[in-house]
Amino acid sequence: MDWNWRILFLVVATTGAHSQVQLVQSWAEVRKSGASVKVSCSFSGFTITSYGIHWVQQSPGQGLEWMGWINPGNGSPSYAKKFQGRFTMTRDMSTTTAYTDLSSLTSEDMAVYYYAR
């Protein structure tokens, strides 16, 4: 029997306590093993050139694992070794949105993905 893994991506936005900051994440995503997924987080109330944009993964029953961040000054991403090669972070200054693309999905990618500043 051929099993197709379906991978759930749920992006949750987190930030420090600040009443003016708003974050809107993309909906949960379901993808087959081997596919790719792009998730997003739109934000307002702060400038993306003043704060780093971090992505964090939490697999079922596991702790938080830092995936990488986008440098606020030059927009360059930096990745944790585990995620290098399959994971791409970008930001769109015009829409104040951060994106992450994850390719060649496996069952190990089933997790909740957090955005943090």
UniProtKB/Swiss-Prot annotation:
It is found in: Secreted; Cell membrane. Keywords: Adaptive immunity, Cell membrane, Disulfide bond, Glycoprotein, Immunity, Immunoglobulin, Immunoglobulin domain, Membrane, Secreted, Signal. The keyword Signal applies. GO terms for molecular function: antigen binding. Residues 70-77 are annotated as: Complementarity-determining-2. PANTHER family: IMMUNOGLOBULIN HEAVY CHAIN. This is Probable non-functional immunoglobulin heavy variable 1-38-4. It comes from Homo sapiens (Human). The lineage of its organism: Eukaryota, Metazoa, Chordata, Craniata, Vertebrata.
